[in-house]
Design a protein with these regions (language model features):
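Canonical positions in the second alpha-helix
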Residues: 9-10, 43-44, 78
Length: 102
């Protein structure tokens, strides 16, 4: 069974598990299935607005697809989420990424 298949099986059993969703998003990014990856990243953010790595990956995905306005917006939301939970390191990292594309 592939890693993707394993994650899908876990997701079927635990559809609210954001960690599994994140794993699925990363798998789909690695196979260049960007639309599916985006769906999982959106699901994570909708379920847990403080899941900071999802913002980072989602913004980077948009940046890599040259959708810079969307990437900027997602970075800003991620910075706010990181600050909300006092994750200063992640906030600073996303601020740096944002500055690079502005």
């Amino acid at each position: 069974m592939s890693r993707l298949d394993s994650l899908l099986k876990i997701f079927d059993q635990y559809p609210d598990d954001t960690f599994t969703m994140y794993g699925l998003a990363m798998e789909y990014i690695s196979t260049k299935d960007y639309n599916i990856a985006e769906q999982y990243l959106k699901m994570i953010i909708n379920k847990d607005s403080t899941y900071v790595p999802a913002y980072m990956q989602y913004a980077q995905l948009k940046e890599n697809l040259n959708q810079l306005d969307e990437a900027k917006s997602i970075y800003r939301a991620g910075i706010d989420a990181a600050k909300k939970i006092n994750d200063i390191r992640s906030a600073k990292e996303m601020e740096n990424f944002l500055n690079d594309i502005e």
